[in-house]
Amino acid sequence: MLARFSSSEGLFLIQAQLTDNSWLLYPEVRLTGGFAFATWWLGPNAGQFVLTLGGYHPSFQRDGYPIVARLGLQWRVSNAIVIKGGSYFALTSEALMAGVEVEVSADFGFAWARIAFGANAIVYFDPFYFMADAYARISAGVKIKTFLGTIRISISLGARIEVEGPDFRGKATIEVGPCDIKVKFGSSREIRGIFVGWDEFV
């Protein structure tokens, strides 16, 4: 754990991270990730704060904010089956965000399969704006040995949806192998933010 107070920089920071030896119930279930709280009263980030478990939304980047590893879990059920997951939550002076992702994979040599799903969402306060996305994918394959050589057969299916507002609109995508079908929905107008302060939002 790290705690830092600097009157010259106008910064108060608390940050912690799980070690490489962190596990849940038994050693095969590994845990990763970190936590941070910071507030500034001087400098370019004066008046801002951040509280995060596991980091930030993929599109959210701010200079000077603490870098925090995703909260994650990796469970090696057996030599062939692995379950991995990650998540984050963050509240800052300008936005609220959260997300999760999970992947289950199995590899038996002659056959394999993977299932993955996840979601991300972020809401900005001023101007008011939100965006969110969710996805799911499944893929599988087999290897067949013949007198002519090894034949590999695989298939993959996926779906993804993205939305944003306040002029609600979005896009849905269906993926079948290398092909995809995209459908747009909602407003076609340019999104204009509605100014909402932190006090009004909460």
Give the residues covered by each predicted segment.
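Extended assembly/interaction regions that build large supramolecular complexes
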Residues: M1-V202
